[in-house]
C-alpha cells in the first residue's frame, strides 16, 4: 500500500503507475475520470438491501425550526470540498433552486457559498477565499482524519457539538441511537424523520467506487485480491480510531463493473449535470445553440446544412456533433458534448436506462399534428417477403433475415421477441443461420449478409449501425431483401410503398410493390403490402427525440421554433427538416409530418408503454440482447430508480 496525503495525490500516483487503485467518492471519481488522469471506476461498493447507491441528505437537530428554503445565514457542516453528499449535491441543489446565485463572471461558487452561510467547516477548502469556509473547523481544515470534522462522521459531529446548524451527509451517517434527536430537511420546505430518506433527500447518488487505470487484467487482479482476503474485516474501521477507512463502514460487498465503464457512465447524467452546474462561471442569459447528434457522415451533412439555415440575428439555434453510432451519441449527450437526437423506440429504452428522457415524438399522420392533447403515435412492424418465394411465418426457420439494426423496434425487438416467445429459444443465430442486423458483433452470423459501403475495400463499414452500411435502417433492410441477400425483411409498414412504383432513390424506383407481400405471424397467412393493419407483428411507439432532463425545455423550444420555419409547411422554403436529400431517414424519419411535445417528466418506459417494455424485458432474458452501453448504465448503480 502507498500512503498519500489526499485523494488527488493518489490519483496522480495511479496515473503514474506507482499505485494501482483507490476508493473514491463520486465527486472524486469525476475528477479522476477527467483529462489528464483518465482513470476508470472498476468496482463499486454495495450497501444494504443490494443497493449500490446512497442518498445525500441535509440533517438538522429536532425543533430548530428552519427549513431547506431558509438556509441562508445558517452555520454549515460539510464532509469535504468537492465530495458528493457534502458539497456537490447540496451546493448544486442550492444553485438549481435559486437560493444561491452567482454574482458575476469572476465569482466562483466558493465565494457565493462563503457569503451564503454565516460560518462553515468545509474540509479541504483552507486555501480558498481566505479560509472563510474553515471558520467552524476546530483545529485544521484538512481533508483527512486529523480534522475531527472531516468526512461523514466528522460533519455529523460538527452538528452534534452545536458548532453547525445543518450537516450535509448521507442517509446512513446518523447512528441509530441518535436518530430520534435529528430530522431531515426536504426540498419542499418540510422536515421528516431520519428514516424517511427515500422520500426526503437532496439526491440519490452513486456509491463510492474503486478507481484504477484502464486495464482490464489489472482490474480483475484487484477484484480478486479484494474479494479473497479472509480473516480481516475490510468494511469496518473499528479499532483504527476513525471511521470509513478504505471503504465506507456501511459497505456490505463489492461489485465488479463492466470493462466499458467510465466515470460519466458510472456517475450518471443527473449527477454529471449537478457537477457541471458547479463548474460554470456564471448564469449566462445567452442560450447557446442546441447541439444535435448526427450518426455518420450523411446525417452530419444534413445537420450542417440545418445548422447554417438555423441562424437568426447572427446566432445559430442548432450546432452539430457527430458519432459513429446511436450509442456513441447517447454517451456524448450524457457527457454534455451533445444535447439531443431522434431515435427508434428500442433505442429510447436504452436511453432511459442511461437517465435520458424522451422530449418530443415524431407524428406520421398529418391530422394528429393540429390536434391538441397527448401525442398518439404508432407505426406497424411488418415482415416482408418476395411474392412467390413461398416464405411464411411457419417456415421462417433456416431462412436469411434482413433487419434495420440490432436492438431496433421493427427490425429486431418485435420480430425476435416473437421468435423467442413462439419458439422459446434464445438461439437466434440457429433460427436464422445468416442475416444482416447492423450493429451486431462483426464475427456474428447477423453480419454475414451485410454489404458495407459497397466500395469493395475493407473500410470497416460492413455491418456498421449507420448509413455507411448499404443495408442499414428501414430502406436498407428492404434493399437487402430486394438484392436477394435475405429472404425476409423486418421493417415498417410504409417502407415498400416509399421505395417502389416510381418512389424513392435510384435503386428503388423501378421496383413494383405488387412483387412483395407481408407475412402474418403464427401461421401461413400472407397479405398484400397495403393490408398492414390486419397483417403485422405489432403496433409500436414512434421514434422520439431524447435529451437530458436539465436541457429538455430548451430542446423543445428550439424544435418547435425550427419546425415553424422548416417543417412540412414551414415559413422558409429553403430547407426542410423532415426530408433527406442524400439518403433515407436522416436525423428524422422521412415520413414525419411534425414533432409533438411529450409531457414533461414522462419517463422512457412510460412513453414506450407496458406492452412494448414487456416485449423488450422478455427479449432481455436472452444473453447478448442488451448492448454494452445499456448493461453499463444499468450496473452503474443509480441509473435505475427504486
Swiss-Prot record:
The keyword Glycoprotein applies. Fe(3+) 1 binds at residues 25, 54, 152, 208. Fe(3+) 2 binds at residues 344, 379, 474, 543. Brain and liver; to a lesser extent in kidney and heart. It is found in: Secreted. Hydrogencarbonate 2 binds at residues 404, 408, 410-411. One of its GO terms (biological process) is iron ion transport. One of its GO terms (cellular component) is early endosome. Residues 1-280, 290-621 form the Transferrin-like domain. GO terms for molecular function: metal ion binding. Disulfide bonds join 77-158, 121-137, 186-200, 293-329, 303-320, 354-633, 369-594, 402-480, 426-622, 436-450, 447-463, 520-535. SUPFAM superfamilies: Periplasmic binding protein-like II. Glycans are attached at residue 365. Keywords: Disulfide bond, Glycoprotein, Ion transport, Iron, Iron transport, Metal-binding, Repeat, Secreted, Transport. The keyword Cell membrane does not apply. Hydrogencarbonate 1 binds at residues 79, 83, 85-86. Transferrins are iron binding transport proteins which can bind two Fe(3+) ions in association with the binding of an anion, usually bicarbonate. Monomer. PANTHER family: SEROTRANSFERRIN, TRANSFERRIN. Belongs to the transferrin family. This is Serotransferrin. It comes from Gadus morhua.
Amino acid at each position: 500500500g502507498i500512503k498519500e496525503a489526499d485523494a488527488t495525490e493518489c490519483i496522480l500516483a495511479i496515473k503514474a503507475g506507482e499505485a494501482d487503485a483507490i476508493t473514491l467518492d463520486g465527486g472524486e471519481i469525476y475528477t479522476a475520470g477527467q483529462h489528464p488522469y483518465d482513470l476508470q471506476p472498476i468496482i463499486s461498493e454495495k450497501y444494504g438491501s443490494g443497493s449500490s447507491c446512497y442518498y445525500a441528505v441535509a440533517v438538522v437537530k429536532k425543533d430548530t425550526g428552519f427549513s431547506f428554503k431558509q438556509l441562508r445565514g445558517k452555520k454549515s457542516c460539510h464532509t469535504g470540498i468537492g465530495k458528493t453528499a457534502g458539497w456537490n449535491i447540496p451546493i448544486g441543489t442550492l444553485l438549481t433552486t435559486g437560493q444561491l446565485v452567482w454574482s458575476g463572471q469572476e465569482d466562483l461558487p466558493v465565494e457565493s457559498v462563503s457569503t451564503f452561510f454565516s460560518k462553515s467547516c468545509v474540509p479541504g477548502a483552507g486555501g480558498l477565499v481566505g479560509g472563510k469556509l474553515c471558520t467552524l473547523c476546530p483545529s485544521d481544515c484538512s481533508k483527512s482524519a486529523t480534522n475531527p470534522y472531516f468526512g461523514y462522521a466528522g460533519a455529523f459531529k460538527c452538528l452534534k457539538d452545536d458548532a453547525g446548524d445543518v450537516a450535509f451527509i448521507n442517509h446512513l451517517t446518523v447512528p441509530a441511537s441518535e436518530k430520534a434527536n435529528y430530522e431531515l430537511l426536504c426540498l419542499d420546505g418540510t422536515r421528516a424523520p431520519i428514516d424517511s430518506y427515500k422520500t426526503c433527500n437532496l439526491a440519490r447518488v452513486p456509491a463510492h467506487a474503486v478507481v484504477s487505470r484502464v486495464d482490464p487484467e489489472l482490474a480483475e487482479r484487484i477484484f480478486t485480491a479484494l474479494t479473497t482476503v479472509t480473516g480481516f474485516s475490510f468494511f469496518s474501521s473499528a479499532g483504527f480510531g476513525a471511521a470509513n477507512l478504505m471503504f465506507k463502514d456501511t459497505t456490505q460487498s463489492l461489485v465488479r463493473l463492466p470493462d466499458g465503464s467510465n466515470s460519466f457512465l458510472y456517475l450518471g447524467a443527473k449527477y454529471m449535470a449537478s457537477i457541471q452546474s458547479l463548474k460554470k462561471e456564471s448564469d449566462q442569459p445567452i442560450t447557446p445553440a442546441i447541439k444535435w447528434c448526427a450518426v455518420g457522415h450523411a446525417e452530419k451533412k444534413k445537420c450542417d446544412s440545418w445548422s447554417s439555415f438555423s441562424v437568426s440575428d447572427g446566432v445559430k439555434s442548432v450546432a452539430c456533433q457527430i458519432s459513429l453510432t446511436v450509442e456513441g451519441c447517447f454517451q456524448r449527450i450524457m457527457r454534455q458534448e451533445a444535447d439531443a437526437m431522434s431515435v427508434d423506440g428500442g433505442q429510447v429504452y436504452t436511453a432511459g436506462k442511461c437517465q435520458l428522457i424522451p422530449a418530443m415524438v415524431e407524428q406520421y399522420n398529418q391530422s394528429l399534428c393540429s390536434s391538441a392533447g397527448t401525442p398518439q403515435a404508432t407505426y406497424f412492424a411488418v415482415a416482408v417477403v418476395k411474392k412467390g418465394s413461398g416464405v411464411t411465418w411457419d417456415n421462417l426457420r433456416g431462412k436469411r433475415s434482413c433487419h434495420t439494426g440490432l436492438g431496433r423496434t421493427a427490425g429486431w425487438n418485435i420480430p425476435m421477441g416473437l421468435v423467442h416467445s413462439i419458439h422459446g429459444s434464445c438461439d437466434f443465430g440457429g433460427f436464422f443461420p445468416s442475416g444482416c442486423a447492423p450493429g451486431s458483433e462483426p464475427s456474428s452470423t447477423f453480419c454475414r449478409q451485410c454489404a458495407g459501403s459497397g466500395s469493395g475495400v475493407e473500410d470497416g463499414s460492413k455491418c456498421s449501425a449507420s448509413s455507411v452500411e448499404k443495408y442499414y435502417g428501414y430502406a436498407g433492410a428492404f434493399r437487402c431483401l430486394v438484392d436477394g441477400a435475405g429472404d425476409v425483411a423486418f421493417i415498417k409498414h410504409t417502407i415498400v410503398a416509399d421505395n417502389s412504383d416510381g418512389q424513392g432513390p435510384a435503386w428503388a424506383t423501378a421496383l413494383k410493390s405488387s412483387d412483395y407481400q407481408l407475412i402474418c405471424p403464427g401461421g401461413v397467412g400472407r397479405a398484400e403490402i397495403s393490408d398492414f393493419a390486419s397483417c403485422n407483428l405489432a403496433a409500436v411507439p414512434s421514434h422520439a427525440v431524447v435529451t437530458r432532463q436539465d436541457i429538455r425545455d430548451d430542446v423543445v423550444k428550439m424544435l418547435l421554433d425550427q419546425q415553424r420555419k422548416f417543417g412540412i409547411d414551414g415559413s422558409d422554403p429553403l430547407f426542410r427538416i423532415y426530408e433527406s436529400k442524400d439518403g433515407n431517414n436522416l436525423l428524422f424519419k422521412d415520413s414525419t409530418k411534425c414533432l409533438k411535445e411529450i409531457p414533461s417528466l414522462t419517463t422512457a418506459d412510460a412513453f414506450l408503454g407496458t406492452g412494448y417494455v414487456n416485449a423488450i424485458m422478455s427479449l432481455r432474458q436472452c444473453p447478448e440482447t442488451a448492448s454494452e452501453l445499456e448493461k453499463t448504465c444499468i450496473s452503474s448503480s443509480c441509473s435505475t430508480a427504486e
